[in-house]
Swiss-Prot record:
Biological process terms in GO annotation: ribosome disassembly
GO MF term (any one): GTP binding
Gene name linked to the record: fusA
Domain tr-type G: 11-287
Organism whose genome encodes this protein: Mycobacterium marinum (strain ATCC BAA-535 / M)
Keywords, comma-separated and alphabetical: Cytoplasm, Elongation factor, GTP-binding, Nucleotide-binding, Protein biosynthesis
Sequence positions that bind GTP: 20-27, 84-88, 138-141
GO cellular component, one term: cytoplasm
Chief place of localization: cytoplasm
Protein name as annotated: Elongation factor G
Function text: Catalyzes the GTP-dependent ribosomal translocation step during translation elongation. During this step, the ribosome changes from the pre-translocational (PRE) to the post-translocational (POST) state as the newly formed A-site-bound peptidyl-tRNA and P-site-bound deacylated tRNA move to the P and E sites, respectively. Catalyzes the coordinated movement of the two tRNA molecules, the mRNA and conformational changes in the ribosome.
Stored CDD domains: EF-G (cd01886), EFG_III (cd16262), EFG_mtEFG1_IV (cd01434), EFG_mtEFG_C (cd03713), EFG_mtEFG_II (cd04088)
Location of this chain's protein in the cell: Cytoplasm
Length: 701
């Protein structure tokens, strides 16, 4: 079969992601998959910075994967489209985004560490999108690797119903291969098969026979319970066939009732091919997952369903935008239904704009295979889309649909950035625009008071990498300020009937608007932070001016009353007002709306909110006291303490403002033996003494 054919038989297609904690060996695993499926001829190692999937210079330097490139490969006449997802917590947006377009995933775990904090987080995100998974316990050759411990951590920490379908043969340096519990044979890689292309199928070693029987029984019990006929057969003492067992495991996996567990060592080239077989055997094809659901543009309540068939109208979701050195903007799309040829016109139904599809490619890391047609169930890169950004839907102009978009968190950390020269100024705005297209969690605004450009992101590493990309890809020389916390302001109590009259009389037509509002704390169910309601009756304010009051109020919310941070979580109710036949205008009511909101907010017990991070520190027992003391001194609240593979884990909620430079402090307190991870948890009110400092700093007193 030619490499560049796209399979139209969707039962043979798998769209999968490989998800894991930073160092569980995700990129290495992906590399091996590409090697054994015959695309990459030289195995790339992350250690040497030569991995095929890590295509930005920085990824190769830091040895972590930032952009999820989509890669296509073939295995035994099946086509696998892999989306590489980053494991670092600052890149959760990339992970969420890739999960949205996957049908299944391989969760890679470190055989020594088992489930780590980050793996927990990625696992929960996959739960959110209901992604079926198989688990691969990697690094079985590492000293201290323990398959059974890893499986236990999956049950305890993830609460997952896992079914081992393989057991390791040997461990650490003597790791040779796996026992296949479905076929009841051992698969071993001999020492002379350097790159592990060949493995031998042999009888199960005698010392493992008992363990294999025990786990085989567990597997069969789980399998038998999926189906009445199998249960009868099993209870009647008959052997279940290999096909019956595989079919049942597939059923359990696709419904996310259970997660098969395999093991191996990608770095030592052992266990990768059986894992590929498991991807085909157990993970869903585009036909096994629910059809895509969306709504008619502009009508949220009119639901539309698109099945993964080429006979349906075309629909696709853009899940990533990347900048390519030659082609400019590359948009990665998952086609959910229908088919479309390159050069066709489609509509971006999210934004209501027409787009023309230039060239279509299926990607291999950063090499491209051009294709003529994009069809349902596959992932493509497209050139030539102008207005499409992450999360937008493309559809057939005559049958429009908006697929559910993705939700992105607000930035929690900001830095001011100043170009060094006039020419850098232009490059800076171009680079910011490009990066914002690629990454929706990267936000930019102009600080009105200082005139500086401020960029915001999900963490220090996230901003470091963005600034670094500006330097490398766009050659921007800029001075970067110290990271600042993204504070917000809100109100604590209801204030009724605040009025404001805006009038100006300077010859000619004046300006006049009078408004009366009440203001109260508010949190929407869908996470909305603002609501406007008009209770004006009897035309006291003409209908066309009411949106202006709303717009004015929202303008005023950009700069809070205490320290100029954005105001959130409030509801404005417009009660009454007055207008003047000649002097009233939209502008007058906008100004009135803006001023009355400031006046009301100042009276509604305003407070400052700060981002609180969920911090998890893993430390040897000896340093436990120091770590806890240090977290307490950072205004941390200890949530839980537990033991994890001989180390202690402290979970705490700590304000982000207290976490700057924590890496260094933790190293020196624990002689480099502890590590930590942190992820945004929520916004909470700042204590009064800290609030005073923040206000004093902001108002320059």
């Amino acid at each position: 079969m030619a490499q560049k054919d796209v399979l139209t038989d969707l039962t043979k297609v798998r769209n999968i992601g490989i998800m894991a904690h930073i160092d569980a060996g995700k990129t290495t695993t992906t590399e091996r998959i590409l090697y054994y499926t015959g695309i990459s001829y030289k195995i790339g190692e992350v250690h040497d910075g030569a991995a095929t999937m890590d295509w930005m210079e920085q990824e190769q330097e830091r040895g972590i994967t930032i952009t999820s490139a989509a890669t296509t490969c073939f295995w035994n006449d099946n086509q696998i489209n892999i989306i590489d997802t980053p494991g670092h917590v600052d890149f959760t947006v990339e992970v969420e985004r890739s999960l949205r377009v996957l049908d299944g995933a391989v969760a890679v775990f470190d055989g020594k560490e088992g489930v780590e904090p980050q793996s927990e987080q990625v696992w929960r995100q996959a739960d959110k999108y209901d992604v079926p998974r198989i688990c691969f316990v990697n690094k079985m050759d590492k000293i201290g690797a323990d398959f059974y411990f890893s499986v236990r951590t999956m049950e305890e920490r993830l609460g997952a119903n896992v079914i081992p379908i393989q057991l390791p043969v040997g461990s650490e340096g003597d790791f040779e291969g796996v026992v296949d519990l479905v076929e009841m044979k051992a698969k071993v890689w001999s020492a002379d098969a350097k790159l592990g292309e060949k493995y031998d199928v042999v009888d199960i070693p005698a010392d493992l026979q008992e363990k294999a029987d025990e786990y085989r029984t567990k597997l069969l019990e789980a399998v038998a319970e999926t189906d009445e006929a199998l249960l009868e057969k099993y209870l009647g003492g008959e052997e279940l066939t290999e096909a019956e067992i595989k079919g049942a495991i597939r059923k359990l996996t696709i419904t996310s009732e259970a997660y098969p567990v395999l093991c191996g060592s990608a770095f030592k080239n052992k266990g990768v091919q059986p894992m590929l077989d498991a991807v085909i055997d157990y993970l869903p094809s585009p036909l096994d997952v629910p059809a895509a659901i969306g709504h008619v543009p502009g009508k949220e309540d009119e639901e539309v369903v698109r099945k993964p068939s080429t006979d349906e109208p075309f629909s696709a979701l853009a899940f990533k935008v990347a900048t390519h050195p030659f082609f400019g903007k590359l948009t990665y799309v998952r086609v959910y239904s229908g088919k479309v040829d390159s050069g066709s016109q489609v509509i971006n139904s999210t934004k209501g704009k027409k787009e023309r599809l230039g060239k279509l490619f299926q990607m291999h890391s950063n090499k491209e295979n051009p294709v003529e047609t994009a069809s349902a169930g596959h992932i493509y890169a497209v050139i030539g889309l102008k207005d499409t950004t992450t999360g937008d839907t493309l559809s057939d102009p005559n049958n429009q649909i908006v697929l559910e978009s993705m939700t992105f968190p607000d930035p929690v950390i900001e830095v001011a950035i100043e170009p060094k020269t006039k020419s850098d100024q232009e490059k800076l705005s171009l680079s910011i625009q490009k990066l914002a297209e690629e990454d929706p969690t990267f936000k930019v605004h102009l600080d009105q008071e200082t005139g500086q450009t401020v960029i915001g992101g999900m963490g220090e590493l996230h901003l470091d990498i963005l600034v670094d990309r500006m330097r490398r890809e766009f050659k921007v020389e800029a001075n970067v300020g110290k990271p600042q916390v993204a504070y917000k302001e809100t109100i604590k109590r209801l204030v009724e009937k605040v009025e404001f009259t805006h009038k100006k009389q300077t010859g000619g037509s004046g300006q006049f608007a009078k408004v009366l509002i009440s203001i109260e704390p508010f949190t929407g169910e869908d996470g909305a932070t603002y609501e406007f309601e008009s209770k004006v009756t009897g035309g006291r304010i003409p209908r066309e001016y009411i949106p202006s009051v709303d717009a004015g109020a929202q303008d005023a919310m950009q700069y809070g009353v205490l320290a100029g941070y954005p105001l959130v979580n409030l509801k404005v109710t417009l009660l009454d007002g007055a207008f003047h036949e000649v002097d009233s205008s939209e502008m007058a009511f906008k100004i009135a709306g803006s001023q009355v909101l400031k006046k009301a907010a100042a009276a509604a017990h305003p407070v400052i909110l700060e981002p609180i991070m969920a911090v998890e520190v893993t430390t040897p027992e000896d340093y436990m006291g120091d770590v806890i003391g240090d977290l307490n001194s950072r205004r941390g609240q200890i949530q839980a303490m537990e033991e994890r593979s001989g180390a202690r884990v402290v979970k705490a909620h700590v304000p982000l403002s207290e976490m700057f430079g924590y890496v260094g402090d933790l190293r020196s307190k624990t002689q480099g033996r502890a590590n930590y991870s942190m992820v945004f948890d929520s916004y909470a009110e700042v204590p009064a003494n800290v609030s005073k400092e923040i206000i004093a700093k902001a108002t320059g007193e």
